[in-house]
Regions:
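Extracellular glycan-recognition regions
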Residues: 8-239
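Beta-propeller blade signature
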Residues: 1-5
Length: 239
């Protein structure tokens, strides 16, 4: 919430009296003089517009040639990586988590990625993990204490029959399960559950990326949120 104090906007609630507002998980809807239906920000994206929805945020100031929206798909061009992990990579296309439990699924065509390039689905924070196409494999990579420059570790990998794949992350509170599939119906878990952590002031985010040298790119057909299935919640609680 925001209020005006001495002609200055004060954001959040000052619960401890130190003069600094703090974020809240719930707050009464403000009285704006008329009734409006409750609405939530857009989350899923079919990539049918000629510009990104307002829910998307680049990890740093964007460059126009990082992406292209055309023919109902998002094209992310590979951008060279200059560090041991993605903490300082500017070309991460992310959005804030919409709920405590959810799934995100995307369809990735990686047939135009070149050698040394990687593209996939990411949970970003101080610790991060992702599932991605790397050559003819699907890989799970993780970095713990990424802000300190910790290199990524390869948690798991599996060979692909082709370079188009469905990628999914199922989130239950802080537990994230990454999986992949060939038909969009049956998904195979890859690697262990990842316990997400917020990333300094930005919190934890979910999104897409494409990295590596050269002129390759990855095409994403859509990016869809859905409620977390009961089976996924049960698996997370069992860990």
């Amino acid at each position: 919430p925001m209020k005006w104090l001495n002609d200055w906007p004060v954001i959040g609630l000052d619960v401890d009296g130190d003069g600094k507002g703090e974020p809240v998980t719930e707050h009464r809807k403000p009285n704006v003089g008329r009734e409006y239906p409750a609405q939530a920000p857009q989350t899923s994206d079919e990539f049918t517009s000629n510009k990104l929805g307002l829910q998307w945020q680049w990890h740093a100031n964007p460059v126009a040639n990082w992406m292209r929206l055309s023919q109902g798909r998002l094209r992310l061009h590979a951008v060279p990586q200059n560090s041991a992990n993605l903490w300082t990579a500017p070309n991460l296309l992310l959005q804030k988590l919409p709920a405590r439990t959810f799934t995100v699924t995307t369809f990735l065509d990686g047939s135009h990625l070149r050698e040394g390039q990687r593209s996939g689905l990411l949970i970003m924070g101080r610790d991060y993990s992702y599932i991605a196409i790397d050559g003819t494999r699907v890989v799970r990579m993780t970095s713990i204490d990424a802000a300190k420059g910790t290199p990524e570790t390869n948690d798991a990998s599996v060979d692909l029959k082709n370079r188009s794949v469905f990628l999914r992350v199922s989130v239950n509170d802080a537990a994230c399960e990454f999986s992949y599939g060939g038909d969009g119906k049956k998904f195979e878990r890859l690697g262990e559950l990842f316990p997400m952590k917020p990333g300094v002031w930005i919190g934890a985010k979910v999104g897409l990326f494409s990295i590596g040298p050269g002129s390759g790119y990855a095409d994403f057909e859509w990016f869809r949120f859905a409620p977390l299935s009961q089976s996924a919640q049960t698996r997370a609680l069992a860990q």
